[in-house]
């Protein structure tokens, strides 16, 4: 059987569209060419006639060839295919998956899964959330939500960290361990409780508070109650987190820079004056050293140190923890000037003899 080119199968029907396979006989064991192969090396129809194939002697799948018949044999790409499949059946690779469009397969069973076979009888027919064959598809990579199926929406709980939304599944909220349903465009009126919205109710909408572990925000005008706005960063921030004068209606508290609430529902216990000069009438309360600051004791914000603690002038009264007397028994001369104050903003006395005033003794500071 001689051939002038590297044809795959002879177009002569007397050879039965046979192809020479490597290793089928000794004379052509290392070549795909059919020039030197005897007729006994050609084996029956592993490929279609030569015009349908390439010039290299390679068996071609029936499904991927335009010459292949209407039958579709199972393959790794189509493990669920039946004999009624046509070349229009879905084909897949390890990177991209496609679905059966115009084929005996129903579109309901065509749900792509990460790096898994999806065809006429896909793995979506057996799901972990419910037993019905039209149940939603779920995998460890990407999950989809069931909208028009016997499965309840409760079975749609994706385990991946990326929202998966389609145009027809807008009524089903996407939730994952990374992105909450609030930030998902497919979430409308339904809001499932999540670690991001521990206090949210079923009436929450996407306008509900959203948070992160770095910069929390609060809900201002939304159906969510203020109780659901509990950030995990620093210390909970209420209402509008800012230090400006026009937002004094609610205290901002954090471990970084707290603000003082003057006329607000917050009590003065949350007032730590660090922001503006208008907050000098609010006593500084800290776990390190409380001060009995009056209006003349605290400097303006421009004189406050880097740690945002008000320092006392030389006329400030500093209570000594070991003294039982009131703060007024301390003389102003006990406090050093601003240049002598430490970086922690603690007023310090110039001489230990000043402390004797707390016990009623006389001393010159």
Swiss-Prot record:
What's the superkingdom here? Eukaryota
Question: Where expressed (tissue)?
Answer: Restricted to a narrow region of the hair fiber cuticle, lying approximately 20 cell layers above the apex of the dermal papilla of the hair root; not detected in any other tissues.
Transport: is it a keyword of this entry?
A: no
A Pfam cross-reference name: Keratin_B2_2
Question: Which positions does the entry assign to sequence repeats?
Answer: 41-45, 46-50, 67-71, 89-93, 99-103, 109-113, 114-118, 119-123, 124-128, 129-133, 135-139, 145-149, 155-159, 160-164, 172-176, 186-190, 208-212, 218-222, 228-232, 233-237, 238-242, 250-254, 260-264, 270-274, 282-286, 292-296, 297-301, 316-320, 334-338
Show the segment(s) annotated as 29 X 5 AA repeats of C-C-X(3): 41-338
Gene Ontology CC annotations of this record:
cytosol; keratin filament
Record bears the keyword NAD: no
Q: Which UniProt keywords apply?
A: Keratin, Repeat
Quaternary context: Interacts with hair keratins.
General function of this protein = In the hair cortex, hair keratin intermediate filaments are embedded in an interfilamentous matrix, consisting of hair keratin-associated proteins (KRTAP), which are essential for the formation of a rigid and resistant hair shaft through their extensive disulfide bond cross-linking with abundant cysteine residues of hair keratins. The matrix proteins include the high-sulfur and high-glycine-tyrosine keratins.
Q: Which PANTHER family match?
A: KERATIN ASSOCIATED PROTEIN, KERATIN-ASSOCIATED PROTEIN 10-9
| Entry's family note | Belongs to the KRTAP type 10 family.
Q: What is this protein called?
A: Keratin-associated protein 10-6
Q: Which organism is it from?
A: Homo sapiens
């Amino acid at each position: 059987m001689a051939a002038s080119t590297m044809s795959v199968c002879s177009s002569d029907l007397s050879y039965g569209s046979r192809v020479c396979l490597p290793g089928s006989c000794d004379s052509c064991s290392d070549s795909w060419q059919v020039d030197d192969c005897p007729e006994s090396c050609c084996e029956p129809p592993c490929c279609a006639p030569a015009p349908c194939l390439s010039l290299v002697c390679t068996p071609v799948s029936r499904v991927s060839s335009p010459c292949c018949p209407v039958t579709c044999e199972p393959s790794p790409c189509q493990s669920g295919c039946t004999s009624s499949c046509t070349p229009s059946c879905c084909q897949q690779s390890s990177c991209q998956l496609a679905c059966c469009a115009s084929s005996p397969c129903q579109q309901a069973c065509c749900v792509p899964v990460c790096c898994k076979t999806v065809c006429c009888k896909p793995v979506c027919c057996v799901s972990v959330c419910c037993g019905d064959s039209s149940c939603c598809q779920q995998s460890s990579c990407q999950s989809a939500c069931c909208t028009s199926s016997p499965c309840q929406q409760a079975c749609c709980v994706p385990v991946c960290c990326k929202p998966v939304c389609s145009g027809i599944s807008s009524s089903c909220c996407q939730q994952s361990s990374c992105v909450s349903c609030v930030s998902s465009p497919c979430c409308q009126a339904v809001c499932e409780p999540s670690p991001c919205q521990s206090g949210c109710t079923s009436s929450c909408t996407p306008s509900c508070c959203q948070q992160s572990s770095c910069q929390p925000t609060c809900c201002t005008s939304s159906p969510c109650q203020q109780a659901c706005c509990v950030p995990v960063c620093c210390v909970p921030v209420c209402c509008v987190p800012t230090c400006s004068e026009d937002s004094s209606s609610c205290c901002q508290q954090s471990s970084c820079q707290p603000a003082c609430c003057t006329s607000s529902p917050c009590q003065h216990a949350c007032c730590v004056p660090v922001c503006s000069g208008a907050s000098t009438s609010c006593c500084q309360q800290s776990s390190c050293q409380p001060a009995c600051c009056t209006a003349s004791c605290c400097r303006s914000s421009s004189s406050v140190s880097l740690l945002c603690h008000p320092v006392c002038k030389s006329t400030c009264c500093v209570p000594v923890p070991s003294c039982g007397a009131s703060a007024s028994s301390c003389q102003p001369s006990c406090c050093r000037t601003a240049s002598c104050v430490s970086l922690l903003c603690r007023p310090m006395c110039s001489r230990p003899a000043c402390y004797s005033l707390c016990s009623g003794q006389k001393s010159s500071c």
